[in-house]
């Protein structure tokens, strides 16, 4: 019987353990940041253990860094975490992409940009959106602080092999519909737990035609579907992205191995979901979970059709209303889901020549310094700033209420991030997950509009 892509990579990395039981996996790449690593480093000190593979461990500063002034860290806890990471990396000889360097950024953007993320690898990080790296045909997953310490000490991790779920996505995306809409639609249709216990392989003609940026957007939100892992078969698009990166180190042996990374024709998946995207609409979440979303033309559901009726109360919305009825106050373009260069370029098309609505505070946070520099070289920053957007420094920013960038209580925010839980963007904040295009257009109009009809709306 053939093997799935996931099984091939998994089996190659098993050090010990029986099928059906926890197995010890070798870890090829460990990415760390300032929030989940301090206790793990301290654990090494207490046990008087060395860091086993500093050469396979890479760090960046992202969660707590201020995006207005990266060196003026007013929050004492944030300042302590950042300084602690800097000291730990120096002590344990870990490469740190530090504040102010050209390589700093959100961890799930730095890995791919530096060529560290590659097909066939096992990749871990103390962050739940590590599945992002699966877009390259890798097994990538988030871990907790105790597991971070285990990888520090052993370069391995005990894991139970999941089942395999194929999401077969086909058809040409309509104009104005994006990768973000695909993953939001899947979560809306099947819920936030349909991927629990599975590794999700995203395949089909649609996936093959997506860029690496778009593939990363989809894999990034596998965790919102309940899955620990999400991955895509590597191909020429993958190779073109990786080949000239600083840490790519493309050897003939590595390239030959990559050619084997696909699911065999006779591979057996435990479950298959099929999606035709030809009629897909822009998606908008209305509630307090990523599954609480609708297509743009669809009214919000009746109370009896949702899992938590308190969501309407928290969000200040009612059944039967539509996305265009929401009174927005903030727009956030950023996060490890949608802060790559192509996201900002696409969003700028809806902004150029227009002004941010008077009721809107609009913020753009490039996901990395590399993206920021590239965007500025193209004049993208000027388009946003001329329109009235704030153009910030790289970081996780308004994706989570951990740093100074927060949405005021009771205010609705169109956000390109990945989670819309209560308080995710600040106490009382009301988050609506959308594509960069939808967020950008909303900043101009002051409300959500159907970006498929952008020209008609803006010229009306």
Curated annotation (Swiss-Prot):
Gene that this polypeptide is encoded by: leuC
Protein name, as recorded: 3-isopropylmalate dehydratase large subunit
One of the GO BP terms on file: L-leucine biosynthetic process
EC number(s) given by UniProt: 4.2.1.33
Quaternary structure and interacting proteins, as annotated: Heterodimer of LeuC and LeuD.
Role this protein plays: Catalyzes the isomerization between 2-isopropylmalate and 3-isopropylmalate, via the formation of 2-isopropylmaleate.
UniProt-annotated binding residues for [4Fe-4S] cluster: 336, 396, 399
Taxonomic source organism: Staphylococcus carnosus (strain TM300)
Catalyzed reactions per annotation: (2R,3S)-3-isopropylmalate = (2S)-2-isopropylmalate
């Amino acid at each position: 019987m053939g093997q799935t892509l996931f099984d091939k990579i998994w089996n190659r990395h098993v050090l010990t353990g029986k099928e059906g039981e926890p197995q010890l996996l070798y870890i090829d790449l460990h990415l760390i940041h300032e929030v989940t690593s301090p206790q793990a480093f301290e654990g090494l000190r207490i046990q008087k253990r060395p860091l086993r593979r500093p050469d396979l461990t890479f760090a960046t500063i992202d969660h707590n860094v201020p995006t207005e002034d990266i060196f003026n860290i007013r929050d004492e806890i944030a300042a302590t975490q950042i300084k602690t990471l800097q000291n730990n990396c120096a002590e344990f000889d870990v490469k740190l992409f530090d504040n102010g360097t050209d390589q700093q950024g959100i961890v799930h953007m730095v890995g791919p940009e530096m060529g560290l993320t590659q097909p066939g690898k096992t990749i871990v990080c103390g962050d739940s959106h590590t599945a992002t790296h699966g877009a390259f045909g890798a097994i990538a997953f988030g871990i907790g602080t105790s597991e971070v310490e285990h990888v520090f000490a052993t370069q391995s991790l005990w894991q139970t092999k999941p089942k395999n779920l194929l999401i077969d996505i086909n058809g040409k995306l309509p104009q104005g519909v994006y990768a973000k809409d695909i993953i939001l639609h899947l979560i809306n249709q099947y819920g936030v737990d349909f991927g629990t216990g599975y590794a999700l392989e995203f395949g089909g003609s649609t996936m093959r035609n997506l860029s690496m940026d778009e593939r990363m957007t989809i894999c990034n939100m596998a965790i919102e579907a309940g899955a620990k892992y999400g991955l895509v078969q590597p191909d020429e698009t993958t190779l073109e992205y990786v080949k000239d990166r600083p840490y790519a180190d493309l050897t003939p042996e590595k390239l030959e191995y990559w050619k084997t990374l696909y699911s065999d024709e006779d591979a057996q998946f435990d479950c298959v979901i099929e999606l035709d995207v030809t009629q897909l609409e822009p998606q908008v979440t209305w509630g307090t979970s990523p599954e609480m979303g609708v297509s743009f033309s669809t009214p919000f559901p009746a109370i009896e059709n949702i899992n938590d009726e308190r969501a309407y109360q928290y969000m200040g919305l009612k059944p039967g209303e539509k996305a265009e009825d929401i009174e927005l106050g903030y727009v956030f373009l950023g996060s490890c889901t949608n802060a790559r260069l192509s996201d900002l370029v696409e969003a700028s098309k809806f902004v150029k020549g227009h002004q941010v609505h008077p009721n809107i505070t609009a913020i753009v946070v490039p996901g990395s310094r590399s993206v920021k520099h590239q965007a500025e070289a193209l004049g993208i920053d000027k388009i946003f700033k001329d329109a009235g957007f704030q153009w910030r420094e790289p970081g996780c920013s308004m994706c989570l209420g951990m740093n100074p960038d927060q949405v005021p209580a009771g205010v609705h925010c169109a956000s390109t991030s990945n989670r819309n839980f209560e308080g995710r963007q600040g106490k009382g904040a009301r988050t609506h997950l959308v594509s960069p295009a939808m967020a950008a257009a909303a900043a101009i109009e002051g409300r959500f509009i159907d970006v498929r009809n952008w020209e008609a709306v803006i010229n009306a």
